[in-house]
Regions:
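Conserved PLP-binding active-site segment in aminotransferase class I/II-type PLP enzymes
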Residues: 1-79, 83, 150, 157
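Active-site-adjacent capping/gating segments
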Residues: 170, 177-178
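Compositionally biased, intrinsically disordered low-complexity segments enriched
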Residues: 5, 43, 143-145, 171
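PLP-dependent aminotransferase-like
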Residues: 78-167, 174
Length: 178
């Protein structure tokens, strides 16, 4: 057996073949320095421009950037008025924040099984988990795929529930042409 390159064996990929990504040039450096020295780093011109472009790219009129998907989920939970004793339906097949953000607001995550073809929330499993304390459904869009939002939204409307879409792992995904 040949020795691994890390232990002195022959390299398969030469150092000059390794490219850094993304490529960084002088204009990138200038933009970073401009942002670092700005008086308003969180709502500065670069943030506002990017929010506007991102909203347009998604076919929306507004976008609000946060430092993480976790922070965005906290904002959604708080914005829906979810709190102590409330239930929020979510899949366990996700980043932990999809459930822990619920706990941080003193609510209880209720785990819904996934569709094993898509690894997304299975709408057929949602209604059985709804209780009088259920306030919302967090739909986690993964791997560039979208859950069956027609079914999820119909169930949510029937039971007067909020729908929160966690699309941190599906930017640019489309559902029925949108």
């Amino acid at each position: 057996m040949q020795e691994l390159a890390i232990y002195g064996g022959t390299r398969v990929i030469q150092p000059e073949e390794v490219r850094s990504w993304p490529p960084v040039d002088k204009s990138d450096e200038e933009l970073v320095l401009d942002a670092l020295y700005a008086k308003n780093q969180t709502r500065g011109k670069h943030n506002l421009e990017l929010e506007k472009e991102f909203a347009a790219w998604n076919g929306n009129s507004h976008a609000l950037f946060t430092n993480s998907g976790t922070a965005a989920l906290h904002m959604c939970i708080a914005g829906c008025g979810i709190g102590a004793g409330d239930h929020v339906l979510v899949t366990a097949y996700s980043w932990s924040s999809s459930a822990t953000c619920i706990l941080h607001h003193d609510a209880l995550p209720i785990f819904i099984d996934i569709d094993f073809d898509t690894f997304l929330i299975d709408p057929d499993k949602i209604e059985a988990a709804i209780t009088p304390r259920t306030r919302a459904i967090i739909v986690v869009q993964l791997h560039g795929l979208c859950a069956d939002m027609d079914a999820v939204n119909a169930i949510a409307a029937k039971h007067n529930l909020y729908v929160i879409e966690d699309a941190c792992q599906a930017h640019g995904a489309t559902y029925k042409g949108r």
